[in-house]
UniProtKB/Swiss-Prot annotation:
Domain HD residue range list: 73-217
Gene Ontology MF term list: dGTPase activity
Superkingdom in the source lineage: Bacteria
Protein name: Deoxyguanosinetriphosphate triphosphohydrolase-like protein
UniProt-listed GO biological process terms: dGTP catabolic process
SMART domains: HDc
Keywords recorded for this protein, A-Z: Hydrolase
SUPFAM superfamilies referenced in this protein's UniProt entry, alphabetically: HD-domain/PDEase-like
Annotated region (Disordered), positions in chain: 20-39
NCBIfam families, A to Z: dGTP_triPase, HDIG, PRK01286.1-1, PRK01286.1-3
One protein family per Pfam: HD
UniProt-listed CDD domains: HDc
Protein family membership: Belongs to the dGTPase family. Type 2 subfamily.
């Protein structure tokens, strides 16, 4: 693998990269900007949205108010965007599109992370379920109210298809999860604006997807060490982490544990990024796509870990699930968060007048399914802090998340 020239100066765009000059456009046509490409405008709209600001107070692993230095959805999103841009630059892709997809990929997450999503999905079981990826699409196509000419952000086709399919096709022979039904909100929007759900997304979207894995694999270690739920000694159980820690300990024999942990994290990010670049170059050389259309028609993703790194990453994930995500102290908080979300849903579904005016107006005309979706939209947009405050306002006792 050659890294020569990567990250320095101008490198010609690859023929299989997404080209903003040939964007498929937007659902609602708009005049082109004289100063920004369509993908740059998408990125800017995402950053200026209300949903983006809310990520600041939404959980990554630890409840947002547990400490100022733990990752939230916002800090995680920024880290994913940085890695996605680096990968796109190395592969001569459109960095702005990769960044836009990375910045928007977690918009649909509920308060309290996957716990909140599971709680809402349980309450929505008879009304189409709840899926954070589908909710991201609803936010950027309907729920953001900023522009006079349309609801949502009216993002370009390329950013929308990257958002929906960054983890792979949803339909057809190459579907990433063929046994899981496609969420109805995605199918409904796709009927209006065909995102080609059976084909792979752009390479830029694939960069955003693998950047997500790289970011949380490394940074959950960082947060786990900070919280005292993981130790450097326990990480010796993970072959990849042990190899990197051995390098750090040999080079810096007297380094304090905090800096040792940071050195592990930065090295893990680097080795994973370089693995993805090398593997993507190998797959591209084999597939020889000549255009972006060739990328969409591939039978597999072209950006991803090598088989060896994927195997090591699976070991790391098993370790994190056992020792961090299902640590007793994390599970206790998850039970409390689950109750908060389900209590709020039950209360608002039974009495929509408990919701703010913008959400309760018109509820009397909705059937049960539409009302449930309205309540889910309201709750999904909450931050951790707001959900706790609303629960305290409506209930005599609120579970302790401290």
């Amino acid at each position: 693998m050659s890294l020569e020239g990567i990250g320095f100066g101008y490198r010609e765009r690859a023929p299989y990269a997404s080209n903003p000059a040939f964007s498929r456009g937007r659902l609602v046509p708009e005049p082109e900007s004289p100063t920004r490409t369509p993908f740059q405008r998408d990125r800017d709209r995402i950053i200026h949205s209300t949903a983006f600001r809310r990520l600041k107070h939404k959980t990554q692993v630890f409840i947002a108010h547990e400490g100022d230095h733990y990752r939230t959805r916002l800090t995680h999103t920024i880290e994913v965007a940085q890695i996605a841009r680096a990968l796109a630059r190395a592969l001569r892709l459109d960095e702005d599109l990769a960044e836009a997809v990375a910045l928007v990929h977690d918009f649909g997450h509920t308060p309290f992370g996957h716990t909140g999503e599971d709680a809402l999905n349980e309450r929505m079981e008879n009304f189409g379920g709840f899926d954070h990826n589908a909710q991201s699409l609803r936010i950027v196509t309907k729920l953001e109210h900023r522009y006079a000419d349309f609801d949502g952000l009216n993002l370009s086709w390329e950013t929308l298809e990257g958002l929906v399919k960054h983890n792979g096709p949803l339909l057809g022979p190459y579907a990433a999860h063929p046994d899981i039904p496609v969420p109805q909100p995605i199918l409904d929007f796709n009927a209006r604006y065909d995102l080609e759900l059976s084909r792979f997304a752009s390479l830029e979207a694939q960069c955003a997807a693998i950047a997500d894995d790289i970011a949380y694999n490394a940074h959950d270690i960082d947060d786990g060490l900070r919280a005292g739920l993981l130790t450097l000694e326990s990480l010796d159980e993970v072959p990849l982490a042990k190899r990197l820690l051995d390098i750090v300990r040999t080079r810096y024999p007297n380094l304090d544990p905090v800096r040792t942990g940071h050195e592990l994290v930065r090295r893990q990010i680097t080795i994973m990024v370089e693995d993805v670049i090398e593997e993507a170059q190998r797959r591209l050389a084999s597939a020889r796509p000549g255009t972006m259309e060739d990328v969409h028609n591939q039978p597999r993703a072209l950006v991803g870990f090598s088989d060896a790194m994927r195997a090591e990453e699976k070991v790391l994930k098993r370790f994190l699930f056992k020792n961090l995500y299902f640590h007793e102290s994390v599970v206790v908080r998850r039970h409390a968060a689950d109750r908060i979300v389900q209590d709020l849903f039950d209360a608002c579904f039974t009495d929509p007048s408990l919701m703010p005016d913008e959400w309760r107006l018109g509820c009397e005309a909705l059937d049960k399914a539409a009302l449930a979706r309205r309540v889910a939209d309201y709750l999904a947009g909450m931050t951790d802090n707001y959900a706790v405050r609303e629960h305290r306002r409506l209930f005599d006792r609120t579970p302790d998340l401290a």
